[in-house]
């Protein structure tokens, strides 16, 4: 009887240890312990060992959240979080800018990846041309990446009306910013 009880407790312990969520994993609906249903007020508990800075411009009546920035213990920025609704602590999250390269997708993409890595591992759904960057979207993962136009050939840098194809983007072009967006 003791052996059976010991076996059951051992199984329970092993299962409970394997259910811990990777704090740096990016999925379509989560990043670490933050999910698309996480409320702004929950960030204090989730990042209790880190520092949280939220900037409110204006006064408490007209103020708006600019962003909520999460810093690690060393003062390095990890994430910038934009709520769906300003000044509403029960709001969920609209957008997360992923700063720290320790955050990675299941396919190994992080904020230090190159365009080749993105193109090899994801189906690119859209490329938008803006004034200073191109925006590479991967709708299947709720991700988009910005790449500085300085990474592009000179004939593509100065006209934001040009249609840019993925074949025109150098493989070694580095990601400028990595975003996880939850529209719904």
Regions found by a protein language model. Give the residues of each.
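Short aromatic loop motif centered on NTY/YTY
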Residues: 129-151
């Amino acid at each position: 009887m003791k052996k059976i009880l010991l076996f059951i407790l051992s199984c329970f312990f092993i299962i409970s240890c394997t259910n811990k969520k990777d704090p740096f994993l990016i999925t379509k609906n989560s990043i670490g312990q933050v999910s698309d249903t996480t409320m702004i007020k929950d960030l204090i508990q989730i990042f209790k060992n880190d520092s949280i800075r939220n900037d409110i411009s204006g006064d408490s009546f007209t103020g708006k959240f600019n962003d909520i920035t999460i810093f690690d213990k060393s003062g390095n920025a990890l994430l910038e979080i934009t709520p769906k609704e300003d000044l509403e602590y029960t709001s969920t999250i609209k957008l997360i800018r992923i700063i720290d390269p320790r955050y990675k997708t299941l396919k190994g993409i992080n904020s230090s990846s190159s365009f080749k890595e993105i193109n090899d591992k994801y189906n690119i759904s859209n490329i938008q041309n803006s004034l200073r960057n191109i925006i590479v979207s991967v709708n299947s993962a709720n991700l988009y990446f910005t790449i500085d136009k300085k990474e592009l050939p000179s004939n593509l840098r100065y006209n934001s009306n040009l249609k840019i194809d993925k074949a025109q983007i150098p493989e070694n072009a580095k990601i400028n910013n990595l975003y996880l967006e939850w529209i719904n």
